[in-house]
UniProtKB/Swiss-Prot annotation:
Belongs to the L/F-transferase family. It catalyses: N-terminal L-lysyl-[protein] + L-leucyl-tRNA(Leu) = N-terminal L-leucyl-L-lysyl-[protein] + tRNA(Leu) + H(+); N-terminal L-arginyl-[protein] + L-leucyl-tRNA(Leu) = N-terminal L-leucyl-L-arginyl-[protein] + tRNA(Leu) + H(+); L-phenylalanyl-tRNA(Phe) + an N-terminal L-alpha-aminoacyl-[protein] = an N-terminal L-phenylalanyl-L-alpha-aminoacyl-[protein] + tRNA(Phe). One of its GO terms (cellular component) is cytoplasm. NCBIfam families: aat. PANTHER family: LEUCYL/PHENYLALANYL-TRNA--PROTEIN TRANSFERASE (PTHR30098), LEUCYL_PHENYLALANYL-TRNA--PROTEIN TRANSFERASE (PTHR30098:SF2). Functions in the N-end rule pathway of protein degradation where it conjugates Leu, Phe and, less efficiently, Met from aminoacyl-tRNAs to the N-termini of proteins containing an N-terminal arginine or lysine. Its EC number is 2.3.2.6. It comes from Edwardsiella ictaluri (strain 93-146). This is Leucyl/phenylalanyl-tRNA--protein transferase. InterPro entries: Acyl_CoA_acyltransferase, Leu/Phe-tRNA_Trfase, Leu/Phe-tRNA_Trfase_C, Leu/Phe-tRNA_Trfase_N. It is found in: Cytoplasm. One of its GO terms (molecular function) is leucyl-tRNA--protein transferase activity. Keywords: Acyltransferase, Cytoplasm, Transferase. GO terms for biological process: protein catabolic process.
Length: 242
């Protein structure tokens, strides 16, 4: 099957069902990262992933990794860290710094090049992309970012500069997102780290149905306002890898 070359003058995408099996999920190449195209992609269960300086690659893998917010696993070590931490968590207060931190952590292997950073900062300014920040006093030490689709949040990347910072960001966000009406977090492709946190694979067709349903659901009006988030203590600990 041939891969579709996107036209810069059209925002259309092929059906995700046309994506390759090898490499898993590759659907189209080219186009650009203008906000309208990115939003069209996320609405169809498609996301960009490519190395800086290369053609833009668009993906919709099968299966798809997802995380139910209330099913996030908390390890014994993280549970202890939550009891002792002095870190504080905020929402939508330093988006550009968070995405830069995600790029920095991956160094030579990053896919978060300047064009990706610029594009997602534009989405943030338009109210579609959001960040969670972890602070040690006034220093940014961790965080995550992603794109909202109604009651579904498409997680893109996270980073830590101190132990457990990104996990605390995710735990705090999951609690907040669930309270605001959030239903599901898209983790894209399952790996050992996301699996240890409770993510699991579902068939792409099922993910696309979830996406369709979630896109029409609205969250509490204050969900994405810049604010401080709490770090609630989990009621019970689920033992996972340290």
């Amino acid at each position: 099957m041939r891969i579709m070359q996107l036209d810069r003058h059209s925002l259309g995408f092929p059906s995700p069902e046309q994506a390759l099996h090898d490499p898993n999920g590759l659907l189209a190449i080219g186009g650009d990262l203008q906000p309208a195209r990115l939003l069209q992609a996320y609405q169809r269960g498609i996301f960009p992933w490519f190395s800086p300086g290369e053609l833009i690659l668009w993906w919709s893998p099968d299966p798809r990794a997802v995380l139910v917010p209330q099913a996030l696993h908390i390890s014994h070590s993280l549970r202890k860290a939550l009891r002792r931490t002095t870190l504080r968590i905020t929402l939508n207060q330093a988006f550009a710094a968070v995405i830069a931190g995600c790029a920095e952590q991956r160094a030579e292997g990053t896919w978060i090049g300047p064009s990706i950073q610029q594009a997602y900062c534009q989405l943030h300014q338009l109210g579609h992309a959001h960040s969670v920040e972890v602070w040690q006093e006034e220093r940014l030490v961790g965080g995550l970012y992603g794109v909202a689709q109604g009651s579904l949040f498409c997680g893109e990347s996270m980073f830590s500069r101190v132990s457990n910072a990104s996990k605390m960001a995710l735990w705090s966000f999951c609690s907040h997102f669930q309270r605001m009406g959030g239903q599901l977090i898209d983790c894209q492709v399952l790996n050992a780290h996301t699996a240890s946190l409770g993510a699991h694979d579902i068939p792409r067709r099922r993910y696309l149905q979830h996406l369709l349903n979630c896109r029409s659901q609205t969250l509490a009006p204050r969900c994405w306002l810049p604010q401080s988030l709490t770090l609630p203590l989990p009621a019970t600990a689920t033992q996972i890898g340290e």
